């Protein structure tokens, strides 16, 4: 075999992937027991040129997939951020005065969007398994109901664990504050009959509606239904994913996987970490411009000074994700250590006097590196969950953690503490410490699980379980990212 050929048994390209058990299940009529990818393995395995493809062929295929998926997902996630940060941009243009909002009412406006997610997350998660992913995704772009959960599911369908951190850092970006700051700055020169804050919401709403239509026609539901891929390319995509033991998709809802997800200690540790990391996000998203204007800057200056946090979050997220992508053994340690940076920023904001404008701004900007550990943590649980129903359950549960943190965040910023917002700063410090402990504990649990499995596993075990829609606990060949 040529040196530039890879097989489905090569490392690190895949491990043994025969899918014999899954193919036998299909032939026996037990389709509900397998991942939908097993069907294409069964249909096309005999048509392939052996089980080989070149490194260059794989590289070109990934590049094509990137160009089809990443830009669309990037725009969707950015618009989701614009939708949530628009309230902060509107705050510098008298939305509180025009609507006669008290400090508490403004805080609840920042929390309110996430209550919808909490109420409808269960039904929406069930729908995500039962209906095609992309029409459902497009609908949620229109409603912004569970976009992040949908994005996470799409990424996990297409990419291997070592490829996910880089894509997550680009897709789940924080460019929204940059765009919102620029839009707010431009709107600041508007002299028309409408209030300036209304113009901001009109622009964001119009972009959202257009994007939902584009998503419906551009994104494929899954690799098997991707019209831009040939049968051979679909086969390669599926075989690349096979070694991860995480599957692609199954339309059968399995209640036993729901219970496994709920009673898994790892679920709760990640839940705590996500909720803790999102408390600062909820507060800063709603009060960012008020914090800056409280330092003595006018509306136009505040709009411009609100742009760097987006760059800090995005660049730190990309940098940390690229570092995390180099290993599957130390990702939780990398995430934990990275939380020290936003923790330092929070301490600066708390300790420095308000008269130290430069120090306060530096502390605020450093605070925004909190997005890096969060987006990297997403790639950790993406890689560590198998079984389609379990994935859906956990993604829904983690969205609830995300929403809970974002609901609590604005409530820690009290109007009677303005412009210092001491309660909000102290809450961020506490949450960062809690997140560090939860992520460390998660890494330890995963490490101990891997050690226990290594004592019993045989090489053939993983191959026998390909595409059987098993969970990470059921498949003893599954190895957790730590």
Swiss-Prot record:
Keyword Coiled coil: no
Glycosylated residues in this chain: 100
Organism: Penicillium expansum
Keywords: Cell membrane, Glycoprotein, Membrane, Transmembrane, Transmembrane helix, Transport
Domain of life according to the entry: Eukaryota
Gene3D superfamilies according to UniProt: MFS general substrate transporter like domains
PANTHER family xrefs: MAJOR FACILITATOR SUPERFAMILY (MFS) PROFILE DOMAIN-CONTAINING PROTEIN (PTHR43791:SF41), PERMEASE-RELATED (PTHR43791)
Keyword Iron tagged: no
Similarity annotation: Belongs to the major facilitator superfamily. Allantoate permease family.
Gene Ontology molecular function terms on file: transmembrane transporter activity
Main subcellular location: membrane
Name of protein: MFS-type transporter cnsL
Subcellular location: Cell membrane
Function: MFS-type transporter; part of the gene cluster that mediates the biosynthesis of communesins, a prominent class of indole alkaloids with great potential as pharmaceuticals. With the MFS transporter cnsO, is most likely responsible for cummunesins secretion and thereby may contribute to intrinsic resistance.
InterPro entries per record: MFS, MFS_trans_sf
Transmembrane segments: 73-93, 108-128, 131-151, 170-190, 199-219, 304-324, 333-353, 361-381, 392-412, 426-446
GO CC terms in record: plasma membrane
Pfam families from the UniProt entry: MFS_1 (PF07690)
Annotated gene: cnsL
Record membrane topology: Multi-pass membrane protein
